[in-house]
Regions:
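Short terminal alpha-helical segments
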Residues: 1-27
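Charge-dense polyanion-binding interfaces
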Residues: 6, 10-12, 61-93
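Acidic, Ser/Thr-rich intrinsically disordered and amphipathic helical segments
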Residues: 11, 15, 34-37, 50, ...
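Short, flexible/disordered secondary-structure transition segments
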Residues: 27-30, 53, 92, 96
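Amphipathic alpha-helical packing elements
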Residues: 31-64
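Juxtamembrane amphipathic/hinge helix adjacent to a transmembrane helix
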Residues: 92-116
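C-terminal single-pass membrane-anchor helix
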Residues: 116-143
Length: 143
């Protein structure tokens, strides 16, 4: 049974963005080496060898080494690579802000998400109600 990248891919990226977001602000040489090795070995752990090979080519084309000097640099590199992969899959690119907003959305408590959804629906119902009232008023006015 082949593992569908549409299932594991988003989780894999969530994990990689978590790794980038928790990278030391100013890493020492040992940490930079450990993260470099981690990134270089990632293709080995992708469930589909062809995808691993493509990812390997991508990190050869855009090496991580210059971006391991700080957390911000590493976050930007991870975002850049994610967008490059998205482009190769005909998926839309996202800004760093969109990516981070989507990332942190996963940490919202269910109660907060439910309350936001309820408010969104209430706004839609309110707008539809106003539109119906305006249409009715226009109809009655033209009578």
């Amino acid at each position: 049974m082949a593992l569908d990248p549409k299932v594991w891919g988003p989780h894999y990226w969530f994990f990689l963005h978590t790794i980038a977001l928790t990278y030391p602000i100013l890493p020492n040489e040992v940490m930079r080496k450990k993260y470099y090795d981690f990134i270089q070995n990632l293709p080995l752990f992708l469930p589909i060898p062809e995808i691993g090979n493509e990812f390997s080519k991508m990190i050869d084309r855009y090496p991580v080494t210059p971006y391991l000097e700080s957390r911000q640099d590493f976050i930007r590199w991870m975002h850049f690579i994610h967008n490059k992969i998205n482009v190769s899959l005909d998926l839309p690119e996202k800004t760093l802000e969109e990516t981070m907003t989507e990332y942190y959305e996963h940490y919202k408590p269910k109660a907060v998400k439910d309350a936001e959804e309820r408010k969104r629906r209430e706004k839609i119902v309110f707008i539809i109600g106003i539109i119906i009232i305006l249409i009715a008023a226009a109809y009655l006015y033209n009578k």
